[in-house]
């Protein structure tokens, strides 16, 4: 026998769905500001130009001499991917969400493991007794491995969602998945990676500080301040991006539908600008730490070579 639904319940469901859609469309309309949208677009274009200028400067002026140049150019390319994805969303009425969301996912997820790689290299360099070679091979292999793994993850997500998945949640706005369950799953995956990165960066920062405290360095206080400040800022940034984990109990409610909040809609522009400043700060800190470490190891090696000759 075929079971049929009561007419009243069917009509009630349709009315509830229509009411939800209308409420979402109203929220999308109320959160739109022509001024803020224009300023966000200008800011994103400026960030793209600055990022491209930085990449060209590293390639043609610095010529990738230092290992830090390789890390920095990777961070800038990852930021460029994210900003390009967001700018396409701003200039497209549909947001081209399947393309732009995966561009932003690729840039941000690669950036997580790039920061971790830099922290790990600082830790390994501190435990090394000889100056590290200037070869970029290991760094390039690590970055290529990260890129391939994240790209594979994106392909798996695309296969799971389907090539025709609708990720649009309003004009110039996208969601993580076509359904609330998928949206929650992708959001939880990203936030979980950010939380893991934050915890590992804090752990590596503590290890570096512990090792510095047990080592005789001429610039030890300055190096400890350097490592502590940049490590905590980096970890705090990833902790903030992992906050959606607190709201996963409400299936997909965070970012699935439009809200009337202007901050929720237009924060990515200033956030990307802040990310560029943090990349520059982190790259400077990394370069300063490695140079100080190399100089200290070189001076120590010269001292030990000089001592036997003086004793004879």
Curated annotation (Swiss-Prot):
Can you tell me which family this protein belongs to? Belongs to the Epstein-Barr virus BILF1 protein family.
Its induction note reads: Expressed early in the viral lytic cycle.
Q: What is this protein called?
A: G-protein coupled receptor BILF1
In terms of superkingdom, the source organism counts as Viruses
What are the subcellular locations of this protein?
Host cell membrane; Host mitochondrion outer membrane
**Which organism is this entry from?**
Epstein-Barr virus (strain B95-8)
User: What GO MF annotations does this protein's record show?
Assistant: protein serine/threonine kinase inhibitor activity; protein-macromolecule adaptor activity
**Mutating residue 122 to A has which effect?**
About 80% loss of constitutive Gi signaling
User: Coiled-coil annotation: which residues?
Assistant: none
User: Which Cys pairs are S-S linked?
Assistant: 28-258, 97-174
Q: What is the effect of changing residue 288 to A?
A: No effect on constitutive Gi signaling
Instruction: Quote the entry's note on domains.
Output: The extracellular N-terminus and third extracellular loop are involved in host MHC-I down-regulation. The cytoplasmic C-terminus is also required for host MHC-I down-regulation.
Q: What would changing residue 115 to A do, according to UniProt? A: About 40% loss of constitutive Gi signaling
* Topology class, membrane: Multi-pass membrane protein
The UniProt function text for this chain reads:
Constitutively active, ligand-independent G protein-coupled receptor that has immunoevasive and oncogenic activities. Couples with the host inhibitory G protein (Gi) in order to disrupt the host chemokine signaling. As a consequence of its constitutive activity, mediates host CXCR4 inhibition. Enhances degradation of host major histocompatibility complex class I antigens via lysosomes, thereby modulating the antigen presentation to cytotoxic T cells. Targets selectively HLA-A, HLA-Band HLA-E molecules. Targets also newly synthesized MHC-I/peptide complexes en route to the host cell surface.
- Sorted alphabetically, which keywords does the UniProt record give? Disulfide bond, Early protein, Host cell membrane, Host membrane, Host mitochondrion, Host mitochondrion outer membrane, Host-virus interaction, Inhibition of host adaptive immune response by virus, Inhibition of host innate immune response by virus, Inhibition of host interferon signaling pathway by virus, Inhibition of host MHC class I molecule presentation by virus, Inhibition of host PKR by virus, Interferon antiviral system evasion, Membrane, Transmembrane, Transmembrane helix, Viral immunoevasion
- Segments spanning the bilayer are 41-61, 68-88, 96-116, 139-159, 193-213, 229-249, 270-290
Gene Ontology biological process terms in this record: negative regulation of NLRP3 inflammasome complex assembly; symbiont-mediated suppression of host antigen processing and presentation of peptide antigen via MHC class I; symbiont-mediated suppression of host innate immune response; symbiont-mediated suppression of host PKR/eIFalpha signaling; symbiont-mediated suppression of host type I interferon-mediated signaling pathway
Q: Subunit details for this protein?
A: Interacts with host CXCR4 to form higher-order heterooligomers. Interacts with host Gi heterotrimer.
The residues exposed to the Extracellular compartment are 1-40, 89-95, 160-192, 250-269
In this entry, the parts of the chain located on the Cytoplasmic side of the membrane are 62-67, 117-138, 214-228, 291-312
CC per GO annotation: host cell mitochondrial outer membrane; host cell plasma membrane; mitochondrial outer membrane
């Amino acid at each position: 026998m075929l079971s049929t639904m009561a007419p009243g319940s069917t009509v009630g469901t349709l009315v509830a769905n229509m009411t939800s859609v209308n409420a979402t469309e109203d929220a999308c309309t109320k959160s739109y500001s022509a001024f803020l949208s224009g300023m966000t677009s200008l800011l994103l274009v400026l960030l793209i130009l600055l990022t491209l200028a930085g990449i060209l400067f590293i390639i043609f002026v610095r010529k990738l001499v230092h290992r830090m140049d390789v890390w920095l150019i990777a961070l800038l390319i990852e930021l460029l991917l994210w900003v390009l994805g967001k700018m396409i969303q701003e200039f497209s009425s549909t947001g081209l969400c399947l393309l732009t969301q995966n561009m932003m996912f690729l840039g941000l997820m690669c950036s997580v493991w790039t920061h971790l790689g830099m922290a790990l290299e600082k830790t390994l360099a501190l435990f090394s007794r000889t100056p590290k070679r200037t070869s970029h091979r290991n760094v390039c292999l690590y970055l290529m491995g990260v890129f391939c793994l994240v790209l594979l993850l994106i392909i798996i997500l695309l296969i799971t969602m389907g090539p025709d998945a609708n990720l649009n949640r309003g004009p110039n706005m996208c969601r993580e998945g076509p359904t609330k369950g998928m949206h929650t799953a992708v959001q939880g995956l990203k936030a979980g990676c950010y939380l893991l990165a934050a915890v590992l960066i804090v752990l590596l920062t503590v290890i570096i500080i512990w090792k510095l405290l047990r080592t005789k360095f001429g610039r030890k206080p300055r190096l400890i301040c350097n490592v502590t400040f940049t490590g905590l800022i980096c970890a705090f940034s990833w902790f903030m991006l992992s906050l959606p984990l607190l709201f996963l109990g409400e299936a997909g409610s965070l970012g699935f539908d439009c809200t009337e909040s202007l901050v929720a809609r237009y924060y990515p522009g200033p956030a990307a600008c802040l990310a560029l400043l943090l990349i520059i700060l982190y790259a400077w800190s990394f370069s300063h730490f490695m140079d100080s470490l190399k100089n200290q190891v070189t001076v120590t090696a010269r001292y030990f070579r000089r001592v036997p000759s003086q004793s004879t």
